[in-house]
Amino acid sequence: TRAARRIGAPGLGADDRARYLAAIDGLAYGDNPGEGLVRGRRFLHPGLSIAFEVPDAFAIENTRNAVLGTTPEGSRRLLFDQVEASGDRSLEDVLRATWNDAIEAGSVENRIVGGRSVATALSRGKDWTFRLAVIRVGETTFRMIMAAKGSTDPDGAFRRWTESLSAIDPAEARTLRPLRLVVVTAGAGETVEAVAQRMVVPDKPVERFLVLNGLERGASLRGGQPYKVVVE
């Protein structure tokens, strides 16, 4: 961030730096619980009372309009969002109306997952293969899309993902809080990698730690100096 990079810039004295770090210590960071939270491979939305877990290797991000996910090499991606649909409209109709490409003939399946009605389908594009689902939870309809590069059908991972959609336990919902920025002191000889492992982030903790602290790759930490990390 701009503020993070400014900390290490010439002209910012030790007193100013100390005051800045004291001011941000404990500040909320990242997602607002009211808009959903990412915790590792889980997404939790107390307001909608839903949660799900993505398959191994996926890292997810909660954006304004959707939850997006990708694998490190980018060969698989996913999207979760909410769609407008009246309760009397069939899920198959909703699925077809919210997908612009062709749906493979005979691939639409209506089933019950976790007590909820679900319509799923397969769509094949030129470069990607898509698994689609529309799920009704109470009065709200959600869409889940998983894409795999090439002709590989991601059905196995897709089913595990859709089957993970569940209601949030009320007790867990009450405990959800935003992540926080905290200031920690590096020990003598402690490395960037060691301190970065304290970060509660969905992926790339080292890269995120470097950006947060205005450091370049390959930088060494100074024992006794304060650094910012993200924690629960």
In which residue ranges do the predicted regions lie?
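Secretory pathway targeting signatures of secreted, lumenal, and periplasmic proteins
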Residues: A51-T98, S123
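C-terminal capping/extension segments of zinc metalloprotease domains
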Residues: T1-A51, A59-L68
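Signature of long, low-cysteine stretches enriched in small and polar/charged residues
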Residues: R96-R143
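Surface-exposed amphipathic alpha-helical segments
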Residues: I60, M144-L181
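Extracellular LysM carbohydrate-binding repeats and other cell-envelope/extracellular binding modules
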Residues: K204-E232
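Primarily a LysM-type cell-wall glycan-binding module
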Residues: E172-D203, Q225
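Short, well-ordered beta-strand elements
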Residues: L79-Q82, E139-G150
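Stable alpha-helical elements in mature extracytoplasmic
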Residues: A3, D16, Y20, S90-L95, ...
